[in-house]
Design a protein with these regions (language model features):
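Short, acidic/polar
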Residues: 12-25
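Active-site beta-strand/loop signature of hydrolases that rely on acidic residues for catalysis
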Residues: 6-7, 23-41
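Structured beta-strand-rich core segments of catalytic domains in phosphoester-bond hydrolases
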Residues: 37, 44-85
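Extreme N-terminal starter segment of soluble prokaryotic enzymes
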Residues: 1-5
Length: 85
């Protein structure tokens, strides 16, 4: 199993620099992105999708801050979007 973790310092800016082209070449089973700094509404377009992956986003409560996003080829057993859940 290949797992990739990456601090993107803004998923939208990283997408413009070729992040998703690179991710599709890496072919990791699980991709964990930190500091995505975007809401679900902001990353709905196809530019933020990866073929054969499901996406799970946990947004920061304050807009433009933090947030994590996971792309996975397999369905997770459980998804926790907050501590203690």
């Amino acid at each position: 199993m290949k797992v990739l973790t990456l601090n993107v310092c803004g998923i939208r800016a990283s997408q413009k620099k070729g992040l998703f082209k690179w991710l599709s070449k890496v072919k990791a089973d699980i991709i964990c992105l930190q500091e995505v700094r975007a809401s679900e509404e902001q990353i709905q377009s196809k530019e933020f999708m990866l073929s054969n992956y499901k996406r799970y986003l946990s947004e920061a409560s304050k807009k433009g801050y933090s947030g994590v996003c996971i792309y996975t080829k397999e369905d997770p057993i459980k998804i926790n979007k907050a501590f203690g859940s």
